[in-house]
Amino acid sequence: MGLGLAFLASCSKEEITVADTQPQNSTSSNQAEVSSESVVRRGQSYIILSSTDNLPGDLASQMQAANGTLTGELSGAGLALATSTDPDFAAKASRISGVRSVIHDFTYQGFAPNSARDVEAVTESDNTNPATSADNDRFFPLQWGHTAIQAPEAWNTGARGKGALVAVLDGGFDLTHPDLVANIAGSKSFVPGEAAQFKGSAFSHGTHTAGTIGAVDNNLGVVGVAPEAKLLLVKVLADGGSGSFSWMIQGIYYAVSQQADVINMSLGAAIPNSSKYRDDNGTPEDTSDDKWVNDTKEIQELLVAISKATSYATKNGVTVIASAGNDANNGQRDKNLVHIPSGATDVISISATGPMGWALKPLETNLDRMASYTNFGTSDVEFAAPGGDAVYPGDDIASIAGVTQYAFAFDMVFSLTSQGRYTWSAGTSMAGPHAAGVAALIVGKAGGQLDPSRVRAIMRASADDLGKPGRDPYYGYGRVNALRAVSQAF
């Protein structure tokens, strides 16, 4: 990357998104890099890390004695949240017996509020030639990712995700989308002042990822990888794309409390180990009093905090999946970046694949081509999954399932968006949900509730080993395969 800091809600750069039933060309990939000014230290908000998985006793009164206010306790994860206007609060609270460290919370801009290109989204009525498929969902022929991972073949064995609960930690969701509503088990927002429902007509990142995992097989638009899994929709990013790590932590903890089997996080940040960060000085709406700080230890402890949350989830039976990031970064060579949450303990990190020109030659195009933007690295990627791409050159037009568009659009992942519509997007954010869907199929095949270590082992044993034999920098242990996964011995 040209800049030292990048973020993702989708993972680092904005995803490429386009939608329309009639072609509207654009040569811009709309993948804007984000400067270091986009990560902001919250001057009066703190994350407390315990030395163990248990919190010190009478923590509220001890926080008060340190001039702080305890705002949340995550018992079992060894984490707590607090606020304080005292600039010396962190130092004071760190001296409490049993406290490992006290760090500031950080906010980041995960994706632009209007990251989609300025086009109309696809609706059911736009389909002038409804296609016939195994499941009869009208836009199923656009879902090349399902073909790549052999999802239909997995369904034919009877494995459809029934009995699995997937928590989707993301931005807002279209809770009334006809292709989603029947599978929604619940929703929750940790974004102050915003409900879980996505407002407006812009691209809905959360709705898109949720649809890939578990859109209902109902003879409508699309179908999810695990169409009978239930979805717990947890909002940890604002509709405008911003988020904080404390919201992420609370979302993970909540998913555990609701007995989720799988967590998908198509979000996060790639932060330099050593860099200057902006502190909002406790006034996030007023930038005139901001200051710049440099605290390498605080970033390292932030990764520890997220790792405590993800480890807590894993210990409580939740398989945690996160997108690897969209910076085309070689994690083996560049050790300066801290990837959160994909680099946290017990997290399964997913890279992205995507075809080039698939709509023009669907039977000849390689669906397992590595996406141009995906992060990679032998220790940074565990599995690959379909994430799409938009690098096909030229103005060729294609038509599939009654939808006519420039050929490059069909190389992206087609799923749900706001106001009951459908759209394309590309990014490792789209890859993670394919892998989470496979994990849900595994849990469902096992009858519900399967130890994360077993889910991981099945995913590893069943992945298609592409690239160099064994674990390689691009595909990890391989591209996930739904059919092979549900065919393993349970």
Regions found by a protein language model. Give the residues of each.
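Inhibitory N-terminal propeptides of secreted protease zymogens
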Residues: 17-118
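Surface-exposed intrinsically disordered loops and tails
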Residues: 127-135, 195-199, 273-301, 330-336, ...
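Protease zymogen maturation seam
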Residues: 97-165, 173, 178-179, 365
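C-terminal motif of bacterial Sec signal peptides marking the signal peptidase cleavage site
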Residues: 7-10
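Active-site-proximal beta-strand/loop segments in catalytic clefts of secreted hydrolases
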Residues: 49-52, 84-85, 104-107, 168-172, ...
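Substrate-binding/access-modulating region of protease and related hydrolase catalytic domains
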Residues: 160-162, 216, 236-346, 357, ...
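Hydrolase catalytic cores
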Residues: 210-212, 232-241, 253, 261-262, ...
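Subtilisin-like serine protease catalytic core
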Residues: 153-188, 194-246, 258-262, 267-274, ...
